[in-house]
């Protein structure tokens, strides 16, 4: 009876070395279970198949039965979804918007200002923008020349009236009179000593002016001296034989 009771006591009593080994094994299993769960949280899509079941490579599959449950969808979340804080969303910079607005304003300032009535315009660089040259008709030129012979300067009402009659703008009439006065002064400066200057006081030097024919006649008269017909024959007499009268009269025919 003593041997049987000793064996039962021996079986019931725990060996310290064996209990320590069992506790170490149980702790190792719990650590592996914890690590496998942590890996599952970090990589949720690892080991997924088309059936939607999650496969683990843990050495103790029975220790984590809740991981083998079938999922309702193939992926636990959208693939494109990223963890919060992975990157900062792009926000437009207010400085770049202000810079673009400033450039747009500078571009608008560089555009030339449009001025009506054909005035001279300036662009953003301060250079003059020349308009195309105005082509006047013969009727307009004739009327302008006639008015210039009457007066070289037009008042504002006279200029407006003349521009309305000819179908021109006031600026075109003003520029034409300015150019005409400039040409007139140049001709007066260079030809005031000769007869051309005297005729320019009374007539215009335009091709449409009737004074050009008189100017041409006077200039040609000064260059070619007058010549008498007798002197002309004397200069060229050697080309023609002299006319001699016959001394014997010819008989008259009956």
Swiss-Prot record:
MF annotations from Gene Ontology: DNA-binding transcription factor activity, RNA polymerase II-specific; RNA polymerase II cis-regulatory region sequence-specific DNA binding
Major localization listed first in the record, in broad terms: nucleus
Subcellular location(s) of the protein: Nucleus
A GO BP annotation: otic placode formation
SS bond partners: none
InterPro entries from the UniProt entry: Distal-less_Homeobox_TF, HD, HD_metazoa, Homeobox_CS, Homeodomain-like_sf, HTH_motif
Keywords: Developmental protein, DNA-binding, Homeobox, Nucleus
Gene Ontology CC annotation, any one: nucleus
Description of the deletion phenotype: Morpholino knockdown of the protein causes reduced cranial outgrowth and defects of the cartilaginous elements of the jaw.
Stored CDD domains: homeodomain
The keyword Transmembrane is assigned to this record: no
UniProt keyword DNA-binding, yes or no: yes
DNA-binding region: 129-188
Pfam families assigned: Homeodomain
Biological role: During larvae development, may be important for neurocranium morphogenesis.
Family as reported in the entry's similarity comment: Belongs to the distal-less homeobox family.
Protein name: Homeobox protein Dlx4b
